[in-house]
């Protein structure tokens, strides 16, 4: 049985109690109750929980496996296929409890995007639910003279295809999930850092920079730097560890 977050804890406890230990239980995210609440717990590395039954990864699990991204690349919509290289995916977040996104922050991002456009890039831009109107507007203005697709919130979000088609990616630092998904591509990821932040976010981004997946977005991009790294697929790492520990406990089944 697999649960996610604190809301799943009563159900996990009930399953353990009524199955009398015959069910292997897993919780994703820190349950804030200590590590004994389940047989196995996954937390991101920037969280503090540790224990013999706790596994950690740098990024969170997501659905963008190498196989899925390869399939998406083979099935690109014509409007994305038509965009000239280099294609730059711009993934916009917004204000949260850690990052402020001042007007000056918005303008800094716009200046960086304008400089990327001058290098001949095309753009694939998608906002998130937290993206404030001014940030989207300045990103729109900064890229309007280049070939681009800017998702306006209507219809299905082409975000999965943007990840698959991108030669480079620009992601705002406020979302661990968006940054982790960008790093599933194995392509260069520039991270834009708004005002404030927190120690957890700083640790997370420093770790990704340390393993060579991301770099800070320069105020003015004079060239699109190339670097490579193994695509980061934490879901596969977690799944293998769940299977390994399950088999250690219950043995192989036929």
What are these regions (language model features)?
Residues 120-155:
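Catalytic donor nucleotide-activated moiety binding site of glycosyltransferases and closely related
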Residues 10-26:
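Glycosyltransferases and closely related glycan-assembly transferases
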Residues 35-102, 217, 221-232, 236:
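A nucleotide-sugar donor-handling region in carbohydrate enzymes
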Residues 34-35, 50, 98-99, 131-137, ...:
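Short, charged/polar "capping" segments at the starts of alpha-helices
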Residues 85-86, 95-127, 131-132:
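Conserved catalytic-core segment of nucleotide-activated headgroup transferases in glycan assembly
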Residues 206-254:
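Leloir-type glycosyltransferase catalytic cores
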Residues 1-6:
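Short N-terminal targeting/anchoring amphipathic segment
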Residues 159-201:
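A donor-sugar binding/catalytic signature common to diverse glycosyltransferases
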């Amino acid at each position: 049985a697999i649960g996610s977050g604190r809301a799943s804890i009563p159900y996990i406890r009930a399953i353990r109690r009524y199955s009398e230990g015959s069910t292997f239980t897993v919780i994703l995210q820190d349950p804030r109750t200590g590590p004994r609440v389940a047989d196995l717990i996954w937390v991101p590395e920037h969280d503090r929980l540790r224990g013999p039954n706790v596994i950690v990864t740098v990024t969170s699990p997501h659905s963008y496996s190498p196989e899925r991204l390869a399939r998406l690349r083979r099935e690109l919509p014509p409007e994305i296929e038509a965009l000239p290289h280099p294609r730059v995916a711009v993934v916009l977040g917004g204000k949260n409890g850690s990052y402020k996104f001042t007007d000056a922050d918005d303008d800094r991002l716009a200046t960086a995007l304008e400089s990327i456009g001058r290098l001949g890039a095309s753009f694939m831009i998608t906002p998130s639910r937290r993206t404030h109107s001014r940030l989207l507007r300045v990103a729109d203005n900064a890229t309007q003279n280049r070939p681009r697709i800017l998702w306006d919130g209507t219809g299905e979000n082409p975000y999965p295809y943007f990840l698959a088609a991108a030669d480079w990616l620009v992601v705002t630092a406020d979302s661990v999930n968006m940054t982790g998904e960008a790093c599933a591509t194995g392509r260069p990821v520039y991270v834009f850092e708004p005002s404030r932040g927190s120690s957890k976010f700083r640790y997370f981004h420093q770790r990704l920079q340390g393993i060579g997946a991301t770099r800070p977005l320069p105020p003015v991009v004079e060239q699109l730097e190339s670097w490579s790294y193994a695509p980061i697929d934490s879901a596969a790492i977690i799944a293998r560890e769940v299977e390994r520990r399950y088999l250690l406990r219950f043995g192989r089944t036929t």
